[in-house]
Amino acid sequence: ATVTASGRITAQTAVDISSDITGRIVQIAVKEGNRVRKGDLLIRIDASQYESAVARAEAFLSSAEASALQSRANRDQARRALDRANQLRRTDPNLVSDEQLEQAQTQFEVAEALAKSAEYQVSQSRAGLREARDQLAKTVLRSPIDGQVTRVAVEEGEVAVPGTFSRETGLLMTVSDLSVIQVNVQVDETDVVRLHLGDSTDVTIDAFPDTSFTGRVRQVVPTADRQK
C-alpha cells in the first residue's frame, strides 16, 4: 500500500556562518544558490582596526625584547661584579668589606629580578601578538564545507556581531551540503502504522516536478512526541 504525504525538505548538514568579532562587512563574495568548496571566501570584514592592533602588538613585542636584552646584560654585569667581589674577598678579606659584598649581592639579586620581569613581559607581548593576529584572521570567513549557499542574511555595509546571546543575532549566512537531504513529513495517524524504518520512499520536489528521488524512512515520530 502507498502512503502519500507532503512535508519540508532540509539539508542533513547545514552550517550557519557567524562572526567571532565585530566589524563592518566590506565584501560578500557569494550569492544565495552559489556552490562553494571548503575554504572558499564567503565574507570579508573591515580589517583596519585589527591590522592596527597587530602593528601595536608587534611594536610592544619589539620594545619588550629590547628591554629584556638590556636587563639580561645588566644581570650578567652584576653577576660578574659579584663574582669579582667574592674572588677578591677570598684572596684578601681586607680588599672587600662586608658592606661592599652585601651591596654587590643585592645589586645582582635586583638585576636578576628585573631580568625575569622583562622576560615575563616578552612572554605577555608574544601572547598579545598571537591574539591580535588571531583576531585579524577572523576578518576573513571561509566555507567550512563543500556545499551550496542556502541563505544570505546580511548585506555589505552592515555590521557583523558575534551571536553571543542568540544564534539568529549573529547569523550571516548558511552553507548546506545538499548531497544528502532529509524530508520531514506529517503523515495521517491512520497511515503511521503502515510505515516502518527502512521503507523505501519516492520523493518529488516542486522545483523538479519531473524528477523522482529515492529515499528511506529513518524515523517515525508520533504526533504526541513531536509536541513535547
Q: Where does each model-flagged region fall?
A:
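Long, amphipathic coiled-coil "stalk"/hairpin helices in large membrane-associated assemblies
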Residues: 2-63, 91-96, 152-155, 187-191, ...
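Short beta-strand-turn/beta-hairpin segments enriched in glycine/proline and small hydrophobics
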Residues: 3-20, 25, 127-144, 171-177, ...
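A structural signal for short beta-strand/turn segments enriched in small hydrophobics and glycine
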Residues: 7, 25, 33-42, 85, ...
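Elongated periplasmic alpha-helical coiled-coil
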Residues: 20, 51, 84, 117-159, ...
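Structural motif
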Residues: 20, 28, 45, 71, ...
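Generic detector of contiguous secondary-structure segments
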Residues: 56-74, 128-151, 194-206
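Alpha-helical hairpins and coiled-coil heptad-repeat segments
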Residues: 62-116
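Beta-strand/loop subdomains of soluble extracytoplasmic proteins
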Residues: 146, 150-154, 158, 168-171, ...
